[in-house]
Amino acid sequence: MGSEKDSESPRSTSLHAAAPDPKCRSGGRRRRLTLHSVFSASARGRRARAKPQAEPPPPAAQPPPAPAPAAAQGPPPEALPAEPAAEAEAEAAAAAAEPGFDDEEAAEGGGPGAEEVECPLCLVRLPPERAPRLLSCPHRSCRDCLRHYLRLEISESRVPISCPECSERLNPHDIRLLLADPPLMHKYEEFMLRRYLASDPDCRWCPAPDCGYAVIAYGCASCPKLTCEREGCQTEFCYHCKQIWHPNQTCDMARQQRAQTLRVRTKHTSGLSYGQESGPADDIKPCPRCSAYIIKMNDGSCNHMTCAVCGCEFCWLCMKEISDLHYLSPSGCTFWGKKPWSRKKKILWQLGTLIGAPVGISLIAGIAIPAMVIGIPVYVGRKIHSRYEGRKTSKHKRNLAITGGVTLSVIASPVIAAVSVGIGVPIMLAYVYGVVPISLCRGGGCGVSTANGKGVKIEFDEDDGPITVADAWRALKNPSIGESSIEGLTSVLSTSGSPTDGLSVMQGPYSETASFAALSGGTLSGGILSSGKGKYSRLEVQADVQKEIFPKDTASLGAISDNASTRAMAGSIISSYNPQDRECNNMEIQVDIEAKPSHYQLVSGSSTEDSLHVHAQMAENEEEGSGGGGSEEDPPCRHQSCEQKDCLASKPWDISLAQPESIRSDLESSDAQSDDVPDITSDECGSPRSHTAACPSTPRAQGAPSPSAHMNLSALAEGQTVLKPEGGEARV
């Protein structure tokens, strides 16, 4: 008994504590990891780091201390782990202060046994230290994939850069740490600045090719002259057209002048050309805000475009900035497709909407009212049931909540339906009968116009599409033939003064040429073919005109067999279309005429002197014919309205075309076979009109048909034009 009491006494307890068992761990409960212990350990670590700095270190030769009592030999239980915890905390703080994502343990806060992370880009499971955290979103990817992604986005000017997994924009600080490339980062910042400036409507970029300076000009519309303030540039440009300053000219005039200059440079530069082999240029259009060129496949895909430079959202069909309701409005633009609706389709859609709107709105209201009255209570009951389903609540409480919610929704649903229909129906009617007609007529889509005060006129003609880069290239590619050139050639090939004038125009087999077929009795009116004694003045002309580039006009004259052939320059035909390019036009014409009257000439004007000269030639030919008539009998006349001696068809005649004085020397040198044909100068050789035949006609021959003279004019692929007769051929 006494020994048991002594062992249980406090004195015996102190003796046992003074000699602890080395196999037992003291303070095991205090090593348990809890949230409080983590924060308390960090506080103890900070105190432990501050304590050695305050106390001086003990001397090295200090004698060992005297033996203390057993109760004071052991250190406190919490003093042993405090030193390692302080060292770990100091290392973590130093690692967190280092720039970059090189030490992921500091950012992760875990050891090497942390869970691996799967990269969403390369689908490879990696340790957490290779998947840095981002400031903008919680998504993580491997460092190599992020660097490659950032380089690709910056090189293609897709800024600002978003997260690969979501639409959150990456922080520039993260981009700088991931790239570690100052030149690429400078390019990123420049693209960001350009995108911001492009969204400013008053920002104007200097048009100088070696300048990237921008001028923000607020309120400069009235004084459009701007000056680049960059040192060494000082370029003056226009605020409106954003091009080089054009004094004493409007923007349209300056634009036309630049187009002509570009056209001339294109003709004389072999490297600048466009053809079908260069690609479909119809797919290139400028952004309506920043004018950056955008290419899109013409496959009928989505027409909602977003500019990568300024972020402008526009429609590819109408090239206008749009909103979310653009494709639901009566603009004629469709979300998919290659072209907008035609004017006829838009008008029919408008009429159908105006007529069918009351029926459609009534059906919508009739369906919406019962759907809301029945659907709202059902929806409320299901939501309340799903909310109480996962909770541990009594069944009576849940049923009471569901019943109360459904009852209130049954009472409120008719009111909600009535308010919705009462507000929605007037809005729909106002949209159909107000917004739709006004928007269509304001944009010219309805085709309603006033016909000179005679009433309202509805036009169903198709609208012209927007002018694209391809249209400009086509204009530069084929500047010689067009609608205006056809009109000019029509006025050139036909002359007035004959009741049988006529001209028909048809498209040739080549896209770069235009074929003109003319059937006219007055084309050479006033000439020998419609003279007083000649009843034949029918002339068929078929010409192919092609633009050629030569340094100067050339022509030659020759004769083959009995027919007279003329090689002449007809650049004036094309000059009537484009007088500025007269020196670069060349057209070779070969003429053969079936009837062969002698010493008759086709002159290029209808002046009185030329007419008198032709009369003198006719008189000389008649005298020669009367003097030598005994030797050879003239063929009988086929006309009933003329006499045998006066009929021109019964006598041989020679015809020559008068040439300009500028090429008379060439003609005289090549006229060895046509010495009997006299030369005649033309006063109108430099005019843009074509050379027509002119000679006086007698009253008896006016308006007579001319079936015996045929002239066919055909064009070679190389640009030469050959005129072939039915009876022979002459080369020009």
From Swiss-Prot:
Q: Name one GO biological process term.
A: protein autoubiquitination
The UniProt keyword set, sorted, is:
Adaptive immunity, Endoplasmic reticulum, Immunity, Membrane, Metal-binding, Repeat, Transferase, Transmembrane, Transmembrane helix, Ubl conjugation pathway, Zinc, Zinc-finger
Where does the record place the region Disordered?
1-112, 618-732
Q: Which residues bind Zn(2+) 4?
A: 287, 290, 307, 310
Residues binding Zn(2+) 3: 238, 241, 246, 251
**Organism annotation:** Homo sapiens
Q: What induces it?
A: In natural killer cells, by IFNB1/IFN-beta and IL2/interleukin-2 (at protein level). Up-regulated by endoplasmic reticulum (ER) stress triggered by thapsigargin or tunicamycin.
Listed pathway(s): Protein modification; protein ubiquitination
Chain intervals with Low complexity compositional bias: 80-99
Regions that span the bilayer: 354-374, 415-435
> How does this polypeptide assemble, per the annotation?
Interacts with UBE2L3, UBE2L6 and UCKL1.
Sites binding Zn(2+) 1 sit at: 119, 122, 142, 145
- Highest taxon in the source lineage: Eukaryota
Q: Member of which family? A: Belongs to the RBR family. RNF19 subfamily.
Q: How does it sit in the membrane?
A: Multi-pass membrane protein
Q: Where does Zn(2+) 5 bind?
A: 315, 318, 326, 333
Give me the residues that bind Zn(2+) 2, please: 206, 211, 228, 233
Compositionally biased region (Basic and acidic residues): 635-648
Q: Where is the composition biased (Acidic residues)?
A: 673-682
Q: What is this protein called?
A: E3 ubiquitin-protein ligase RNF19B
